[in-house]
Amino acid sequence: TLEEVMEVMISGEKQEKKVVRLHTGDPCLYGAIKEQMDLLEKENISYKVCPGVSSFCGAASALNAEYTLPGISQSVVITRMAGRTPVPEKESIESFAAHQATMVIFLSTGMLEELSKRLIEGGYQPETPAAIVYKATWEDEKVCRCKVKDLAVTAKENGITKTALIVVGEVLGGEYERSLLYHPEFTTEFRQGKGKEGAGNV
């Protein structure tokens, strides 16, 4: 519980020990750290939050994927299905799906039939590329590619019931546009572009 965690941290501080509260991934995502920081401040205990590597970054590596492909998506939505922790109505899966951006969905592996339904109702085509990444960056990591409509059956066939991320979007397909960043006609701070668009910038 929060109280038990705080008891250990406060006790360590009183004993002048170096206390590390270790989280998986990056604590800024679904880490419940705000309440811990508030209680530390109440006790006048200083702290430092160190960044980690979120599983959604690990999943991109496992997929050899770029979440922001030119001409496909320049945005990434990180969200979850409502469970024991509610999700505000304005942040529904359907409302995010309407943007057709890349979506990375946490904490929803046990609700994949409902997730597929909501993604499709929101605007994704049933055939939209998707992936289930189980235990990203772990030794027993597993990557299962599928379509949005097949999320539930794919998870069942591979024995995945928890500890997985769902990635959805056309960035998992094969189409994209060449980036401007490395285009010969594109000017940056370090390189003058060649051609009529040489003065262009992102």
Predicted regions and their residues:
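Class I S-adenosyl-L-methionine
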Residues: 1-50
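A contiguous loop/helix-start segment that scaffolds small-molecule binding in enzyme catalytic cores
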Residues: 4, 15-19, 32, 38, ...
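General beta-strand structural signal in soluble alpha/beta enzymes
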Residues: 20-24, 47-52, 57, 69, ...
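Short, contiguous strand/loop micro-motifs
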Residues: 23-24, 43, 79-80, 102-103
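Gly/Ser/Thr-rich loops at beta-strand to alpha-helix junctions
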Residues: 26-30, 53-55, 110-112
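Proline/glycine-rich low-complexity loops and linkers
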Residues: 37, 66-70, 85
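Short, acidic/small-residue loops that bind anionic groups at enzyme active sites
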Residues: 39-59, 70-79
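Active-site-proximal loop->helix
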Residues: 61-68, 90
